[in-house]
Amino acid sequence: MQIRQSVKFKKPLIHYITNPISINDCANMILAVGAKPIMAEHPLEVSEITSISESLGINLGNITDNKMKSMLISGKTSYEKKIPQVIDLVGVGCSKLRLDYAKKFISECHPNVIKGNMSEIKAIYGIKSSAKGIDVGECDIITEQNFDENIEMIKRLSMETDSVVAATGVVDIISNGTYTYIISNGCEMLSMITGTGSMLTGIIASYISSGNILEGTALAIAIMGICGELSQNVKGTGSFRNELIDNMFSISDDIIIKKIRINSY
């Protein structure tokens, strides 16, 4: 839990270029874990903003020409200055524009973390996926039957890109090619409100700011799942959203240790 307490103590500045659909919730979630968000996206200022930040988050949801330009500028600045960065592959399974752009970004900016659902991870690896818009396709969901082959693919992608790869879903797989974590926390309601994946990327950006990339990514994913579990006994999805942010703000180390379901592979 040292990573979590370090973020609360240091309050790192997190530059997150994300989509307008969830930008407010993303900023609030970064605040909830103790970091400070800045959501700048103008091409003429993003390099300067990234330079003074401790971490960078890149989200491919709802992209535009200007935002694509800004993301590449920030990504290159982050790489040059050794600032940790995470890219969220939103929609690369259903959009050639996003897929081609994501490949270019990974090649030129070398993000520390590549995050996506299994459809998005398969697409970036070069395997045909069955993505349903930005959601994971039914055929791509991790099952007992395809578990081992998906882990091997994730490990290979990690080694090829020199990035931690985080495949999120009912079961989360996080790997740096050598060490792999399997996380089984979460609940169905996390997929029933928009933006929870984008919020998670903001938390990952916050937790990797210390430079502990694999553990920071795994911790962020586990805590998001636990907070989902703690928040689900509510009237509906609107209440769930608010409860999720509240639990992220107030959750204790003791509850995390008690509820975390994580295994190494």
UniProtKB/Swiss-Prot annotation:
Query: Its pathway?
Result: Cofactor biosynthesis; thiamine diphosphate biosynthesis; 4-methyl-5-(2-phosphoethyl)-thiazole from 5-(2-hydroxyethyl)-4-methylthiazole: step 1/1
Record-level GO BP terms: thiamine biosynthetic process; thiamine diphosphate biosynthetic process
Which cofactors are named for this entry? Mg(2+)
Which of this chain's residues are annotated to bind substrate?
39, 195
EC category name: transferase
Task: Specify one Pfam family.
Answer: HK
Q: Which UniProt keywords apply?
A: ATP-binding, Kinase, Magnesium, Metal-binding, Nucleotide-binding, Thiamine biosynthesis, Transferase
Query: Which GO MF term does the entry hold, naming one?
Result: ATP binding
Reactions listed under catalytic activity: 5-(2-hydroxyethyl)-4-methylthiazole + ATP = 4-methyl-5-(2-phosphooxyethyl)-thiazole + ADP + H(+)
EC annotation from Swiss-Prot or TrEMBL = 2.7.1.50
Q: Give the signal peptide as a residue range, or say none if absent.
A: none
Ligand binding (ATP): 115, 168
Q: Does the keyword Transit peptide apply?
A: no
Explain the purpose of this protein: Catalyzes the phosphorylation of the hydroxyl group of 4-methyl-5-beta-hydroxyethylthiazole (THZ).
Regarding protein family, the annotation reads: Belongs to the Thz kinase family.
User: What protein name does the entry list?
Assistant: Hydroxyethylthiazole kinase 1
Organism of origin is: Clostridium botulinum (strain Loch Maree / Type A3)
Phylogenetic lineage = Bacteria, Bacillati, Bacillota, Clostridia, Eubacteriales
Q: Which gene encodes it?
A: thiM1
